[in-house]
Amino acid sequence: MITVDIMGGLGNQLFQIMTVIAYSKKYNNPFVIERKSHSPSCTFRNVYWNNFLSKLEKYLVNCPVNFPVYQEPTYEYRELPNISNKDNIKLAGYFQSYKYFDTYKDDILKEIGYDNIKDDLKNKLGNAVKPCEMISLHFRMGDIIRVHKDNNIIIPLDYYINAIKHIETRVSQNTPIKLLYFCEAEDNDYVITNYIIPLRNMFSNTSYYKASDTLEDWEQLVLMSLCEHHILANSTFSWWGAYLATNNDNKNNKIICYPDKWLHSKIITHSTIDLFPDNWMMIRA
C-alpha cells in the first residue's frame, strides 16, 4: 500500500495527491491518504476532501499510516522507487514536477471528476464571465510579504508587460485582449494601483476583470483553468490553473507564460528545472 504526507496549500497538495495516485496506478498498488482537518504548513491551510476532492474521500483513513518513508531527495524530478503491488511505502516531499503523473493525468482527472467540477462552476457563473475568451493573470502578494519573503519574490510589473507582449505576437492582430486576473482580496488595491492601471495604460487593446472574491480558492483555480491562455505568477496555484487547462501535448495550443524567477535567488537548492512542460514559455522580467 502507498500513502503520502499532505502539506502546503492547494497547489502543493495537488502535486502530492497526483503523484501518489499515479504511483499507485503504475504499480497496481492501492493508496490511502490520512484524513486531516487541515494541511500542515507554516500557516493554516485548508484541505479539500469535502468539496474539490470529494471523489477521493473513499481513499481517506482516519489514523496515521506508518510505512517506510521515501523522502524526496531533491526538487528535481527523480524516478520513484520500483515497488511490487504488495510493498508499503510513504512518500514525503513536494514532488513538484509534471513528470511524476503526466502519463496518468487523464485517468486521475476522471477519478477526481474534474469535468463535472468544471461544468458545475460554469453553471454557477452563468453568463457573468466567459473565461474561454480570456487570459488568466495571477498576482501573488500577501503570503510572500507575510510568510515567505525569504523564499519567494514578488514578480515585477515588467514580467507581466513582457508576457502580454508575447501573447500579442501569437494572437490575431487588432484582437481585443480580455484578461481575468486573480489575487487575494486583501491585495486588490495594491494590484490595481501597481499592476492593472499601468498595464491598462500601456496596452490600449486590453480590458481587465477581477475574478470574484466570493469564490472559494479551489473554485478560482478551476475558473483559471477555463481560460484561453495563462500568465502565471511564481505560484503552484496558477501552475495548476494552467496545467489543468491543457491536454498532455497541448493540442489546444494554449499560450502559457511563467516567470524566469520562481524563488528567491538565495534558495539555490530548490531547482525548478523539471517543473514546467517544454511547451510553456519562460518570460523574463
What kind of region is each of these model predictions?
Residues M1-T3:
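Extreme N-terminal starter segment of soluble prokaryotic enzymes
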Residues I6-F15:
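A short, glycine/small-residue-rich beta-strand->loop->alpha-helix junction that serves as a flexible
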Residues L10, T175-D249, N253-H264:
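Donor-binding and catalytic core of enzymes assembling or modifying cell-surface/extracellular glycoconjugates
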Residues N12, S39-R45, K99-Y100, I144-V147, ...:
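Short catalytic/ligand-binding loop motif for oxyanion handling, primarily in non-cytosolic enzymes
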Residues Q16-Y23:
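Short amphipathic alpha-helix
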Residues K36-I177, F276, A285:
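Secretory-pathway luminal glycosyltransferase catalytic domains
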Residues H264-A285:
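Leloir-type glycosyltransferase catalytic cores
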